[in-house]
Amino acid sequence: MENKYLDYKRLYKVVDYVINKYPELNRESFEEGSMFIYYPEERKIQISNVIDEIEFEGNKFLEKYLYEEFDLYIPQDKMFIFSILHEIGHYFTFDMNNFDEYCRMLRELSDENYTEYRKIPEEYKADKWAIEFIKNNKNILSI
C-alpha cells in the first residue's frame, strides 16, 4: 500500500472546531509531524497528514473497537478525525502523576497489540474524551 496524504487544511478545520469549543486550547498547542501523538511533558499535540500501511491496518482495528466498545461507527475516511480528537483528549485528561506507569505499560506492549494499548488507562481516557466530543458534536464528522 502506498502512503496516503491528507490535506492539512482539512486537519486544521478539525483543530479549529475544537479550539472554538475549548478556547484554552490554541494553534500553538499543535505541531505538524510524522504521526498523531501527544507529548505530555510539553503539552503538545502532533498531527500528521500521512496515513501509512501500519496506521491503515491499525485503523481497521480501531473502527471495529470503537463500534464494539462505544457503539460508534466511524468510517475509514474519517478516522483521522478520531485520531486528532484522541490526542486532544490526552491534552485534557492526561494525568502526569501516572506518567512513569504509562511509559512502563507502553514499553511492555508489542506494536501489534492494539487491544491492550486501548486498555491503558491514559489511552482509554483519551478515547472516551474523543467519543464524547463526537457524540456531542456529530457534525464534526462532516469535515
Question: What is each model feature region?
Answer:
Residues 7-23:
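Zn2+-dependent metallopeptidase catalytic core
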